[in-house]
A protein has these predicted regions:
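N-terminal cap/lid segment of alpha/beta-hydrolase-fold proteins
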Residues: 1-26
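The serine-hydrolase catalytic nucleophile loop
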Residues: 38-50, 64
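Alpha/beta-hydrolase active-site loop
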Residues: 77-98
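Alpha/beta-hydrolase fold nucleophile elbow
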Residues: 98-111
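Alpha/beta-hydrolase-fold enzymes
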Residues: 119-219
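Short beta-strand/loop motif that positions the catalytic acidic residue
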Residues: 257, 263-265
C-alpha cells in the first residue's frame, strides 16, 4: 500500500503491484489504473492492475480524491479538474520510483474514469500511452443524460437516441441543484444523493439490463465493497457533484491527443 499527494494537497492511497521477476536495477513500464466511476481500488481497478503486473508492468490501482481510502473532504465528491489531476499525480509517483522507466508510463481508465484518462493524457505529455475500458465522458452524461434508448434492441445492444436533456431541461436541473446548495452548505456539503444502484431484490422485468447488471455487481458478494459509492445502500454521490460536470466539459482538446490510445468496448456495451 502506498500514499502520494496530488498538486491540490490531497493524499491519495493506492496499491502498488510489482512483477515478481523484476531484476535488480531494472526499470519497467508502468500503468496507473482507476475506475469504475464510484468504485474503489479493491474492485475493478485492482483486478486490472494485478493482471497487467502479471504481464510485466509495474501497476498502481488507486482511489481518487474524496473516495475510498484517499483523502479529501467532503466525502463522495468528484471534480473533472481534480480527478484529471489525480492521474497526473499517479504519474508523478510512478516516475519517482527507481524501478520505473519514466519514458514508459501509461494510464488506464475504466467507465467514467476512461474520460478522465483521455483528458489527462491530452494535458500531461509524460503519459506515453492511454487506454480506456467501457468508457463514459461523465461531463457529457451529466449535461445531456444518456444518449441511448434505455432498452436493448433485438441484437442485445443499445440504439442511439436524442439526449435526455436539452438546454431548458439542463437549466431546470441546475436550478434544482443550486437551490439544494443551501441545505448542502449547512451540512458541510456532505449531503448525499439517493443510492444510485438498485438492490438486486428490487429488480423487475422492466428494469433496464445495464442497471440490473450494476446491481448484480455492486450489491452482491461478487463486487460489493463497503467503501465504494456504488455499493452504498444509504446514499451515493454528494448532491453538488453534477454542477461542475455539467458546466466544465472535459475532452475539449481531444483532437490534440498524441499518445497512443486504445479504447476497448464490448460489442453491446451500454456506454
Amino acid at each position: 500500500k502506498v500514499t502520494f499527494r496530488n498538486r491540490y494537497g490531497i493524499t491519495l492511497v493506492g496499491d502498488l503491484y510489482v512483477p515478481k521477476n523484476i531484476r535488480s536495477g531494472q526499470k519497467l513500464p508502468a500503468i496507473a489504473v482507476v475506475g469504475a466511476f464510484g468504485a474503489v481500488k479493491e474492485q475493478s481497478s485492482g483486478l486490472y492492475a494485478q493482471a497487467m503486473a502479471e504481464r510485466g508492468f509495474v501497476t498502481l490501482a488507486f482511489d481518487p480524491s474524496y473516495l475510498g481510502e484517499s483523502g479529501g473532504e467532503p466525502r463522495n465528491m468528484a471534480s473533472p479538474d481534480i480527478n484529471t489531476e489525480d492521474f497526473s499525480a499517479a504519474v508523478d509517483f510512478l516516475g519517482l520510483q527507481n524501478f520505473v522507466n519514466r519514458e514508459q508510463i501509461g494510464i488506464l481508465g475504466i467507465c467514467g474514469w476512461g474520460g478522465m484518462a483521455l483528458n489527462a493524457a491530452v494535458g500531461d505529455t509524460r503519459i506515453k500511452a492511454v487506454a480506456t475500458s467501457t468508457m463514459y465522458d461523465m461531463t457529457r452524461v451529466m449535461a445531456n443524460g444518456y444518449e441511448i434508448n434505455m432498452k436493448q434492441n433485438a441484437q442485445g445492444g443499445y440504439d442511439r437516441a436524442q439526449p435526455q436533456m436539452d438546454a431548458e431541461a439542463r437549466y431546470q436541473t441546475k436550478v434544482q441543484l443550486n437551490n439544494g446548495r443551501w441545505e448542502a452548505a449547512q451540512n458541510g456539503y456532505a449531503t448525499l444523493a439517493p443510492a444510485n444502484n438498485l438492490d438486486p431484490k428490487d429488480i423487475t422485468a422492466d428494469t433496464p439490463k445495464f442497471i440490473a447488471e450494476y446491481a448484480d455487481f455492486y450489491h452482491t458478494k461478487r463486487g460489493f465493497h463497503p467503501r465504494a459509492v456504488n455499493s452504498n445502500p444509504q446514499g451515493s454521490w454528494a448532491t453538488t457533484v453534477p454542477l461542475a460536470f455539467i458546466n466544465m466539459p472535459i475532452l475539449q482538446r481531444a483532437g490534440e491527443l498524441r499518445a497512443p490510445t486504445l479504447i476497448v468496448h464490448g460489442e453491446k456495451a451500454h456506454s
